[in-house]
Amino acid sequence: MVCREQLSKNQVKWVFAGITCVSVVVIAAIVLAITLRRPGCELEACSPDADMLDYLLSLGQISRRDALEVTWYHAANSKKAMTAALNSNITVLEADVNVEGLGTANETGVPIMAHPPTIYSDNTLEQWLDAVLGSSQKGIKLDFKNIKAVGPSLDLLRQLTEEGKVRRPIWINADILKGPNMLISTEVNATQFLALVQEKYPKATLSPGWTTFYMSTSPNRTYTQAMVEKMHELVGGVPQRVTFPVRSSMVRAAWPHFSWLLSQSERYSLTLWQAASDPMSVEDLLYVRDNTAVHQVYYDIFEPLLSQFKQLALNATRKPMYYTGGSLIPLLQLPGDDGLNVEWLVPDVQGSGKTATMTLPDTEGMILLNTGLEGTVAENPVPIVHTPSGNILTLESCLQQLATHPGHWGIHLQIAEPAALRPSLALLARLSSLGLLHWPVWVGAKISHGSFSVPGHVAGRELLTAVAEVFPHVTVAPGWPEEVLGSGYREQLLTDMLELCQGLWQPVSFQMQAMLLGHSTAGAIGRLLASSPRATVTVEHNPAGGDYASVRTALLAARAVDRTRVYYRLPQGYHKDLLAHVGRN
């Protein structure tokens, strides 16, 4: 009996001991979770390679994924500046990293917080990170001015990250390419910089830029296509998010190149920055804002311009200014949205001659203008628009009337006769130079080239040459002549079209007939889309070719290839039927 009582007491002790151990483990786990997961911050958003917007949104420091809500503190280098930055309501700290005593006998190799030519500081990078990581939740952007500072700094970041102390996005910046107006090379070595990041601290956001110079008393050049393409060549293959710092005073003139750059990868964004002495136009900032998704561009701009820009940018009644060579995003299609939501509309015309007026459907979308020519090339030709009613309106009058209509529009010029191509492009160029063309513009035609050479159609080379020479800021929309499509879109037809369009920097939307997709080479749409990040496909159908039921399967198959990059140029009734079918399923 005594033995049993003793055994029972021992069991009770072990039970209590077990409960105590489990409780300690649970409490430790909770404490660890709270430590790693600061209030409001989602774990994925708190990693060094996280999206800055996701991080700030998790903390409640911004209200939506809009990069305009992010605020910046410049040159938080000295302890005094760092303390002021930490006590501010700024969301991201920007600081410069150099090497102590760089280029002197006193060079130590220690990373310090200083902007060249300063090579000494009361703040080392280690001290700076200790203060910022320990007392704030602010995002971090480190600007490296010399390659010698990069390796030791990344080693320190890696150590702190492994210790669990870096729970926020880290941006690693360096100017790695020679940019506008630079007479000498002062950039950080691109190859070494990128290699060090991949080797020592790959879980970060890259911020590679161009060295620039601006002088108000002399002519200033802007970023060139070659500069932008070289940058993409350098970083296109890296796995990180990439945000390109761009001098805001130079961005508008180079927008065709940056529009191209942003379209090359969903990992890309821009950070517009302003030097204190730079003249800056709020209209230029609004132009960039209008032509990008709100998460694609950060604005590191000084006051009072920043507040003025924000007020105008968020004004829903302001009339936006769209780049004619841009995509339909965000004007007619939200990022990631279904291309089926973009509708093609055909205007009608009442009257004739100078008194003719144009009417549009109530909905918004792409305005299809079948364009021909009045008169001969030798007689001062006038581009005209053919309408379903048979009435004719000049293209210039049509575009000017459209400019007065409220709403969101894109323009799709379908060149019906070869002689109308260059006069139509010349008109677009003139209206654009006058500031009267504020929508995305597509210029398309059924073209003759290679295995689909057919007399009477616009020559494929001529379409591309005319666009390049007369008005390059458009989306090119080539299609195949019906005469060669008896067996559908065969392999050689696809190959010749892709070879023709290879290397274009403009967006391309290949025009395909729905009735023929079922008879075509397997994967035809996918192959066209794979040719470029900017490539799209527009599936069209004429009611004379059959009712909706006859093309429904082909339309749904096209949509299954890519919901976001396939558009549908259909009669309004067919478009509604397709929307209804997709909605039911």
Curated annotation (Swiss-Prot):
Q: Which domain of life is it from?
A: Eukaryota
Key words of the record? Membrane, Transmembrane, Transmembrane helix
Q: Which InterPro entries match?
A: Memorin (IPR019356)
| Membrane association type | Single-pass membrane protein
**GO cellular component term of the entry, any:** extracellular exosome
Which Pfam families does the entry mention?
Menorin
Please tell me whether the keyword Transmembrane is annotated for this protein.
yes
**Which cell locations does it reside in?**
Membrane
- Key word Membrane present in the record? yes
The transmembrane segments are 14-34
Q: Which family does it belong to?
A: Belongs to the menorin family.
- What this protein is called in its record is Protein FAM151A
Species name: Homo sapiens (Human)
